[in-house]
C-alpha cells in the first residue's frame, strides 16, 4: 500500500476529482486504435469509468477475451510521455490497473508491441494531449533496479539471488515438485508427471557424470539440494554444494540433519568465485546457475570450475541460452529483470561454448532440452494456478499474478524457440587420455 504524506494525500484527492471528469482525448484514442487493431483477440479497455472501447478482433458479437480497467488518466499520461510499456506493470502493482480475463492473452500483446511506437506526425499531438491529462502524485515511470553496485559484483549477485530465491521455501514448495527442483525436468513422454520427470533428470545427470561411490561431487548453485542428495543416496558420492540463498541454505541444513547425511554432504553459502583454486572435486555440476553469471564473467566462471576439478574429471553445465543475441532491452527481458529475476543474463550457446573452449575445456557432449523446459513450465504454471490462494497470501495477489504471467511467458518462450536450454558435458583439455564411453548410449546405460 502506498504511504503518502498529508500534502500528498490532499494532492491525490484533488487529482482524483479531476480524473473523474477527464475524457479520453481523441488523438490518444486514434493512436490506441491503430496500435491495437491487429490484436488476435478482443481487448476492452475502460478508462477511469469515463470511456470504454473495444480493440482487436473484428467479430464484435463475442465478448472480449481480456478487459483492462485503467483507474487514473495519469497512467496513460506516464505511458505516453515515457514510451515505456512497463509503466503498465507498475500501474497494476499500484492498484491503478485491474485485469479481467485470461492473463496469457497479454503475452502476444507484449510480443506484438514490444515498444511504444509514436509516428512523428502523431508525436506532438499525443505529447500535448498526454501532458494535459491529470498527473499522478507519484512517479510511475518504470526504472531498472539500482543499488549503486557494479552489475555482477559479488554483493549485487548475492542481493539478486536472494531477491529471487529468498521469497520463502514454502512459496516454492507450493508449485514445484516434492523435491523442490527449480530447473528443467526430463520427460520420457508428454504424459509423464512432473515429479517423475524431475527424478529422471536427476538420475540422468548422475549417469552423464559417470558418478562412482567415493567420488566427490561439487554442485555450483545447488538450490534446495535435490541433486546432491540424489547423488549421495543413489550413487554413493560425497557431496558439496554452494548457494547464495540464505533460505536454500537453511533448507539444505534441515534436510541434511533429517536424513542423517552430515558425514557425506555439506552445503555452504559461497560465491563460485571463492571456490578452491586447486583440484579438489572428481566431478562438478551446475544446473540453472550460469544464467546468473553474466557474459563478461563467463571466463571467470569456467576457470573457477576448471581449477577445482581433478584430472580426469567431468563438468556438466546445464543452462538456458537465447536463440538470438540479447542485450537486455526487450520488454520481456526488462520485465523479468525488474519484477522477477534481477540481473539474469542469457547468451547464445555458441558464445558460452566459445568461452569454455578458450578457458581450457573440451566439449564432450551437447544435449538440447528445449521441449522439456516448455513442458516443465506448463506444469509449474498449472501448479501455481491451483495454489494461487496460498501463494497470493505470501506475495500479495498482484505480485502473485505477475509470477503466474512470468511462468506462462517463459513457457511460450521455449515453445516458440525464443529461449533454449542445453546440457553440456565438458572435460579439461589437459586430459589427453579418453576415459569416457565412445557413444552417448554409454552414458545412458
What are these regions (language model features)?
Residues 1-192, 196-198, 204, 233:
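Feature captures hydrophobic
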Residues 213-221:
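Conserved class I S-adenosyl-L-methionine
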Residues 224-235:
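Conserved SAM-binding loop of SAM-dependent methyltransferases across substrates and taxa
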Residues 260-272:
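Conserved SAM-binding strand-loop segment of SAM-dependent methyltransferases
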Residues 273-284:
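A short acidic, Gly/Pro-enriched loop at the edge of an enzyme's catalytic core
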Residues 299-311:
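A short glycine-rich, Lys/Arg-flanked "PGG" loop and its adjoining helix->strand segment in the class I
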Residues 312-320:
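Conserved beta-strand signature within the Rossmann-like core of class I S-adenosyl-L-methionine
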Residues 320-434, 440-444:
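Substrate-binding/catalytic lobe of Class I Rossmann-like enzymes that use SAM or dcSAM, i.e.
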Amino acid at each position: 500500500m502506498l504511504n503518502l504524506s498529508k500534502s500528498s494525500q490532499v494532492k491525490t484527492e484533488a487529482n482524483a476529482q479531476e480524473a473523474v471528469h477527464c475524457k479520453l482525448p481523441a488523438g490518444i484514442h486514434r493512436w490506441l486504435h491503430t496500435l491495437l487493431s491487429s490484436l488476435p483477440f478482443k481487448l476492452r479497455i475502460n478508462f477511469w469509468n469515463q470511456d470504454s472501447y473495444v480493440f482487436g478482433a473484428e467479430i464484435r458479437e463475442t465478448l472480449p477475451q481480456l478487459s483492462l480497467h485503467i483507474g487514473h488518466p495519469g497512467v496513460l499520461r506516464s505511458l505516453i510521455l515515457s514510451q515505456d510499456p512497463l509503466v503498465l506493470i507498475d500501474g497494476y502493482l499500484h492498484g491503478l490497473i485491474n485485469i479481467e480475463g485470461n492473463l496469457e492473452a497479454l503475452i502476444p500483446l507484449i510480443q506484438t508491441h514490444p515498444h511504444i511506437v509514436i509516428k512523428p506526425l502523431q508525436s506532438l499531438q499525443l505529447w500535448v494531449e498526454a501532458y494535459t491529462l491529470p498527473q499522478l502524485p507519484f512517479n510511475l515511470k518504470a526504472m531498472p533496479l539500482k543499488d549503486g553496485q557494479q552489475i555482477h559484483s559479488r554483493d549485487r549477485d548475492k542481493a539478486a539471488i536472494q531477491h529471487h530465491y529468498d521469497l520463502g521455501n514454502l512459496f516454492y514448495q507450493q508449485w514445484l515438485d516434492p523435491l523442490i527442483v527449480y530447473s528443467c525436468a526430463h520427460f520420457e513422454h508428454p504424459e509423464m508427471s512432473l515429479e517423475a520427470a524431475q527424478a529422471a533428470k536427476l538420475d540422468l545427470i548422475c549417469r552423464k557424470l559417470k558418478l562412482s561411490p567415493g567420488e566427490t561431487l561439487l554442485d555450483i548453485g545447488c538450490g534446495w539440494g535435490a541433486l546432491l542428495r540424489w547423488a549421495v543416496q543413489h550413487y554413493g558420492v560425497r557431496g558439496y554444494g554452494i548457494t547464495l540463498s540464505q533460505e536454500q541454505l537453511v533448507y539444505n541444513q534441515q534436510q541434511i540433519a533429517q536424513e542423517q547425511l552430515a558425514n557425506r554432504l555439506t552445503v555452504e553459502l559461497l560465491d563460485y568465485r571463492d571456490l578452491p583454486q586447486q583440484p579438489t572435486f572428481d566431478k562438478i555440476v551446475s544446473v540453472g546457475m550460469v544464467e546468473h553469471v553474466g557474459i563478461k564473467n563467463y571466463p571467470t566462471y569456467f576457470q573457477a570450475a576448471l581449477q577445482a576439478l581433478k584430472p580426469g574429471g567431468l563438468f556438466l553445465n546445464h543452462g538456458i541460452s537465447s536463440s538470438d543475441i540479447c542485450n537486455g532491452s526487450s520488454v520481456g527481458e526488462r520485465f523479468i529483470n525488474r519484477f522477477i529475476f534481477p540481473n539474469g543474463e542469457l547468451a547464445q550457446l555458441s558464445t558460452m561454448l566459445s568461452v569454455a573452449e578458450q578457458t581450457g575445456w573440451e566439449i564432450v557432449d551437447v544435449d538440447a532440452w528445449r521441449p522439456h523446459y516448455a513442458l516443465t513450465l506448463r506444469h509449474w504454471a498449472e501448479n501455481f494456478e491451483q495454489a494461487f490462494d496460498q501463494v497470493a497470501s505470501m506475495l500479495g495477489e498482484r505480485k502473485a499474478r505477475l509470477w503466474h504471467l512470468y511462468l506462462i511467458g517463459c513457457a511460450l518462450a521455449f515453445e516458440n524457440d525464443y529461449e533454449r536450454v542445453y546440457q553440456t558435458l565438458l572435460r579439461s583439455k589437459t586430459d589427453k587420455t579418453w576415459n569416457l564411453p565412445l557413444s552417448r548410449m554409454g552414458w545412458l546405460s
